[in-house]
Amino acid sequence: MNEAIHVQGLNKTFSHKSALIDLALSIQPGEMVALIGASGSGKSTLLRHLAGLACCDRSNGGQVQVLGREVQSSGRLNSQVRRLRADIGYIFQQFNLVNRLSVLDNVLLGCLGRMPRWRGSLALFNNEEKQRAMVALERVGLADLAAQRASTLSGGQQQRVAIARALTQRAEVILADEPIASLDPESARRVMEILADINRRDGKTVVVTLHQVDYAVRYCPRAVALKSGRIHFDGQAQDLSKQFLNDLYGADADASLMITERSQRVRQKARLTLAKV
């Protein structure tokens, strides 16, 4: 079986500053993985390279493969990357919705990667695509808001619309870049539970960048910690220690980053809740 994600020797430099350094990573189909680390550690940069939204260095840049297909190598994107992106759902921190469009129309945009360009440019969605979008909205609890303008939704609701768009896209790999960074605790919990449910029930590979370690421990079996463009930890999220996190986050480490007994209990409760769904 092909790896869902394979990264080898990935290097990225911005203005002579290394953002990713000889990075290697393998993720198996159906895994849910948290990328953690302080701001500027390379989490979002790595995620963008996985989706082919950024190119690695041309000299010794490395290689990225998703679902057994090459996304990029040595600073050059695969000429067929648009087709590959149809299998990669990308969820942005700031939602990336079209505010003037309805919730349903935003979700239907997930179909564009599998449509002829002429039909997509005219927004000619068929009944099967519309039904699929409504099923996705039902799953994230927003079917009753399908006709509402996206601009009227709360941040948590907009992020759930973005998840529904990825479901409508029928993506095999979902990449979520700080999806809960700007959300209140209840909205953050709901977004993470939806992503975990998609991973568990649908077998989708989910990679999520998180600044909040307690959410990583609660919802992601595996964690990969980055610091200064290098991987410093790759293992079970529950094995992350307070000492390691203090070293990882440095001056940014505070009570919200620490794994407490309470967060461990909440994690177990969340897993039990998901098992009953």
Swiss-Prot record:
Kind of enzyme, top EC level? translocase
Got a GO cellular component term for this one?
A: plasma membrane
Q: Which Pfam family is one of those matched by this entry? A: ABC_tran
Report membrane topology. Peripheral membrane protein
Which residues are in the ABC transporter domain?
5-253
Query: Recorded E.C. number(s)?
Result: 7.3.2.2
Catalysed reaction, written as an equation: phosphonate(out) + ATP + H2O = phosphonate(in) + ADP + phosphate + H(+)
Residues recorded as binding ATP, renumbered to this chain, are 37-44
GO molecular function terms attached to this record? ABC-type phosphonate transporter activity; ATP binding; ATP hydrolysis activity
Where is it mainly found?
Answer: membrane
State the InterPro entries in the record: AAA+_ATPase, ABC_transporter-like_ATP-bd, ABC_transporter-like_CS, ABC_transpr_PhnC, MetN_ABC_transporter-like, P-loop_NTPase
Keyword tags:
ATP-binding, Cell inner membrane, Cell membrane, Membrane, Nucleotide-binding, Phosphonate transport, Translocase, Transport
Q: Is Cell division among the key words of this record?
A: no
Localization, per the record, is: Cell inner membrane
| Cell membrane among keywords | yes
Function recorded in the entry: Part of the ABC transporter complex PhnCDE involved in phosphonates import. Responsible for energy coupling to the transport system.
- What family does the entry list? Belongs to the ABC transporter superfamily. Phosphonates importer (TC 3.A.1.9.1) family.
Subunit (UniProt): The complex is composed of two ATP-binding proteins (PhnC), two transmembrane proteins (PhnE) and a solute-binding protein (PhnD).
Official protein name in the record: Phosphonates import ATP-binding protein PhnC 2
Traced from the root, the source organism's taxonomic lineage reads: Bacteria, Pseudomonadati, Pseudomonadota, Gammaproteobacteria, Pseudomonadales
